[in-house]
C-alpha cells in the first residue's frame, strides 16, 4: 500500500513540465477508473413476465416470474460487496474528474482557444503564454493520492496500476538518473526554442568523462532508441545525452514539435495505455493475474 501511494503520487509528478500534461493524465486515468467501476455496478432491472403470456400449462404457485433485481447484473455477479467497493471508488473519481476538467480550462485554455481560432497569431501567443494556472506539486499529489485511496480501499490495486502504464514506463526510463547512475539535473523538461516555437529534447552535459558503467548504460539506451548521444568526433567520448523522460523520448523519436503537439502525443499514449490495460484486465486476466483478479 505504501509503495502504491508513493508511486501514484510521484508517477504523475515526474511526467510533467508542459502545460496540460499533468491534468490530462489525471483526467484519462480517472475516466478509465470510472468506466471500470461502471462495469461492476448493476442496472436496477426488475422484469416480471406473466406466465400466461408464455403459454405455460404447468401448475405453479406464482402467476409471474421475476427476472433481475438490484444485485443480479454487472460483473459483480451478485456480490453486494463488490458493488459497494466500486461505488466507493465512484464517490472519489466523479468529483476528481469534475475538478480536473475545470482546471484544464485554465491550464490548457489558450490551446483550446488555438484549436477554435486556428490563427498564426494565436499560435505564437499560445506558445509564449500557454496557461493561466499551473498545477505544481499540489494537483499531482491530490490526484495521485485519490487514485491510491480508491485502488487500496476498493481492492483493485493491480487494475489501477495497469492504468499507469505510461507512468511506469517513464519511471523505468528515468531510473538511471533517479538513482544516480547518470547525472540528473534539477529540471528535465524539454527545451523550448524561442525562434521556432518548438520543443527539443533537453540534455545533460558531461564535464568529465563518464564512468564505464554510465557509458555502458547510455550506450545500451541509445541502441534501444531511448536516448540520443552527442560524442566527441575524435575520441568518441560521450559529451551529452538527452534526459531520460518519456517526453524527451517522444521528441527523440518523433522530432521537434510544439507544446500542443507534444501534449496530444502524451494524451494519445495515455489513452492507448488505458485501452491496453482493459485488454489485459478482461482479456488476459487468467494469464496475468494468477487467480487474483483484483
Question: What does each model-identified segment do?
Answer:
Residues 3, 20-294:
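Alpha-helical transmembrane segments
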Residues 2-22:
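Function-critical hydrophobic alpha-helical transmembrane segments in multi-pass membrane proteins
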Amino acid at each position: 500500500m505504501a509503495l502504491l501511494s508513493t508511486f501514484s503520487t510521484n508517477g504523475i509528478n515526474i511526467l510533467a513540465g508542459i502545460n496540460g500534461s499533468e491534468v490530462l493524465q489525471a483526467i484519462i486515468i480517472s475516466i478509465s477508473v470510472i468506466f471500470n467501476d461502471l462495469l461492476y455496478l448493476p442496472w436496477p432491472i426488475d422484469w416480471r413476465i406473466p406466465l400466461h403470456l408464455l403459454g405455460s400449462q404447468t401448475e405453479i404457485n406464482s402467476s409471474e416470474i421475476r427476472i433481475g433485481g438490484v444485485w443480479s447484473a454487472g460483473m459483480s455477479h451478485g456480490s453486494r460487496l463488490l458493488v459497494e467497493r466500486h461505488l466507493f471508488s465512484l464517490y472519489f473519481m466523479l468529483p476528481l474528474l469534475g475538478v480536473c476538467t475545470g482546471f484544464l480550462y485554465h491550464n490548457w485554455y489558450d490551446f483550446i482557444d488555438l484549436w477554435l481560432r486556428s490563427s498564426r497569431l494565436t499560435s505564437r501567443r499560445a506558445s509564449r503564454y500557454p496557461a493561466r494556472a499551473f498545477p505544481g506539486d499540489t494537483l499531482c499529489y491530490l490526484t495521485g493520492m485519490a487514485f491510491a485511496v480508491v485502488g487500496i480501499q476498493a481492492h483493485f490495486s493491480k487494475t489501477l496500476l495497469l492504468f499507469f502504464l505510461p507512468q511506469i514506463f517513464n519511471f523505468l526510463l528515468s531510473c538511471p538518473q533517479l538513482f544516480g547512475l547518470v547525472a540528473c539535473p534539477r529540471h528535465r523538461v524539454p527545451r523550448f526554442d524561442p525562434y521556432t516555437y518548438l520543443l527539443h529534447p533537453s540534455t545533460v552535459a558531461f564535464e568529465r568523462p563518464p564512468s564505464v558503467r554510465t557509458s555502458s548504460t547510455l550506450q545500451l539506451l541509445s541502441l534501444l532508441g531511448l536516448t540520443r548521444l552527442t560524442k566527441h568526433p575524435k575520441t568518441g567520448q560521450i559529451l551529452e545525452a538527452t534526459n531520460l523522460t518519456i517526453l524527451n523520448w517522444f521528441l527523440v523519436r518523433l522530432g521537434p514539435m510544439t507544446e500542443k503537439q507534444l501534449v496530444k502525443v502524451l494524451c494519445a499514449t495515455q489513452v492507448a495505455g488505458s485501452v491496453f490495460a482493459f485488454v489485459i484486465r478482461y482479456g488476459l486476466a487468467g494469464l496475468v493475474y494468477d487467480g487474483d483478479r483484483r
